[in-house]
Design a protein with these regions (language model features):
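Core register positions within helices of long alpha-helical scaffolds
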Residues: 229-232, 265-269, 297, 336
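Primarily the internal scaffold of c-type cytochrome electron-transfer domains
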Residues: 1-235, 279-290, 294-298
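TPR/TPR-like (Sel1-like) alpha-helical repeat modules
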Residues: 268-272, 283-285
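Amphipathic alpha-helical scaffolding segments comprising HEAT/armadillo-like alpha-solenoid repeats
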Residues: 204-212, 238-252, 273-281
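Eukaryotic intrinsically disordered, low-complexity regulatory tails and linkers enriched
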Residues: 307-342
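Solvent-exposed, polar/charged alpha-helical surfaces in well-ordered, non-transmembrane soluble domains
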Residues: 224, 228, 246-250, 261-265
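Structural detector for tandem alpha-solenoid helical repeats, activating at a conserved register
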Residues: 221-222, 243, 258
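Short coil/turn segments at helix-helix junctions and helix-capping linkers
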Residues: 253-259
Length: 342
C-alpha cells in the first residue's frame, strides 16, 4: 500500500520508481508494524485517524485486497529468504484469474522451499495428507482479506495463533475450516500438537463457535468473512451441511448491502436454498420478510441434524436454536461504521 502527498505532481509524472530500483527508496509504503521507523506515516495517521482501520487488522496485517505486497513484506519467507511475488505467480502460462504459475495452486508452492515436509506431510499437519487440513495455504494463508464481495487469502504467510486471533479479531485459520468449533478448542489442539501456550480467552471464545461469534457480533468485515466461510466447501465438509443456513439468515437484513450479498451467496449453496428468492438491495421490510422466510425453510427441513445438541452452535437437545443466546450475541454486534477500501 503506497502513499503520496496531494501536493506532489504524481498525477502527471507518476512515482519515481523504475524497474530495478529500490522500491522503498522511491515509493512510500504504509507499514503499521514499522510506525516508529516511519515518522511521515505517524503524521499521516494523525491527519487520517481511520486510515489504518480501513485497510489493516489491529496488528498491521492487511484485511483488504489489492495490497498483497504489504503482506509479502511482513512475511518471514521474504524477510529472511528469497520469497517474492514471482515465487508463486507468473505473468505467462497462468490462469488470468489468479496468475499462479504451474502447480502453484498446490503444496508445491511451499514445498519448493520447505522440501523437508514433502516426505511425511501428515506428521507436520496432523491431518490426512490429501485433506484440506494438509493444504499449506489453508493454514498459513487463510482467507482473512475481504475482496470483491468475497474472501481471498492473506498474503502475509503466518501460522495459526489463538492469542493473535483473540487480540485482533482476525479469524483463526483452524476455525475457518472447523467452523463449528470454539477458539478454545483450537488453542487446546495447537498446544497438544505444536506446544503453543494456551492463552486466556473470553468466556464466549471458550463456549461458542468462533466463526458463529464473528457472524453474529463482529464488525461488518468480520461478518462478511464469517458468512463466506460458512458457504466454503472446505468448511462445510468438516463442519456439516445443515446448521449454517439458520445463522446466515440473520445477515439477510444486515445494515451493509455487501454483507447481505455475501450471506445470500453462501446461503444458496445449501440444500433447500438453491432457488431462494432474495434481493439484497430491497426495502427493509422485504429484507426482514426474506429473513423470516429463510428461517421457516430451515425449520421445516426437520430437527434430526447431526449437529443437534451442539451448545457451541447454540443448538439445544432438539436441534433448535437457543433464541435467548442468539439474541444476546446479536445485541453485542459491532455496528461501528466501517469501510474496507480495496
Amino acid at each position: 500500500m503506497k502513499w503520496w502527498d496531494e501536493k506532489e505532481e504524481w498525477r502527471q509524472t507518476g512515482f519515481d520508481y523504475r524497474p530495478g530500483d529500490d522500491l522503498t527508496a522511491t515509493t512510500p509504503i504504509i507499514q503499521p508494524t514499522k510506525m516508529d521507523e516511519l515518522p511521515w506515516l505517524q503524521q499521516i495517521v494523525e491527519k487520517n485517524p481511520s486510515l489504518l482501520r480501513d485497510f489493516f487488522w489491529p496488528d498491521g496485517m492487511m484485511r483488504v485486497s489489492g495490497r498483497e505486497y504489504n503482506g509479502l513484506l511482513e512475511t518471514a519467507c521474504h524477510q529472511d529468504g528469497d520469497m517474492s511475488c514471482v515465487s508463486c505467480h507468473s505473468m505467462h502460462k497462468s490462469d488470468p484469474d489468479d496468475m499462479l504459475a504451474k502447480k502453484m495452486e498446490t503444496n508445491q508452492a511451499c514445498i519448493q522451499c520447505h522440501s523437508s515436509y514433502k516426505k511425511n506431510l501428515s506428521a507436520h499437519t496432523h491431518h490426512a495428507e490429501e485433506s484440506q487440513g494438509s493444504q499449506c495455504y489453508n493454514c498459513h494463508m487463510p482467507h482473512t482479506s475481504f475482496a470483491l464481495l468475497s474472501a481471498i487469502r492473506s498474503h502475509q504467510v503466518d501460522s495459526p495463533d489463538v492469542a493473535a486471533s483473540a487480540a485482533t479479531g482476525r479469524p483463526n485459520a483452524c476455525n475457518l475450516c472447523h467452523a463449528d468449533q470454539s477458539l478454545q478448542w483450537t488453542a487446546e489442539f495447537l498446544n497438544e500438537w505444536y506446544e503453543k501456550p494456551i492463552p486466556e480467552v473470553a468466556n464466549e471464545d471458550q463456549e461458542i463457535s468462533s466463526v458463529l461469534k464473528h457472524l453474529l457480533q463482529g464488525d461488518a468485515g468480520q461478518r462478511a468473512l464469517a458468512a463466506w466461510h460458512l458457504g466454503w466447501p472446505s468448511s462445510k465438509d468438516v463442519s456439516g451441511h445443515h446448521w449454517q443456513p439458520r445463522f446466515l439468515a440473520e445477515l439477510l437484513d444486515d445494515p451493509y448491502a455487501a454483507v447481505r450479498y455475501v450471506a445470500y451467496k453462501a446461503l444458496k449453496s445449501f440444500s433447500g436454498f438453491e432457488s431462494f428468492g432474495y434481493d439484497y438491495v430491497a426495502s427493509d421490510k422485504q429484507l426482514q420478510e426474506a429473513q423470516s422466510r429463510a428461517v421457516v425453510i430451515w425449520e421445516k427441513q426437520g430437527n434430526a441434524f447431526p449437529e443437534a445438541q451442539s451448545p457451541q452452535l447454540l443448538l439445544n437437545d432438539s436441534g433448535r436454536v437457543h433464541s435467548e443466546q442468539l439474541q444476546a450475541l446479536l445485541d453485542k454486534r459491532d455496528d461501528t461504521p466501517i469501510r474496507l477500501r480495496e
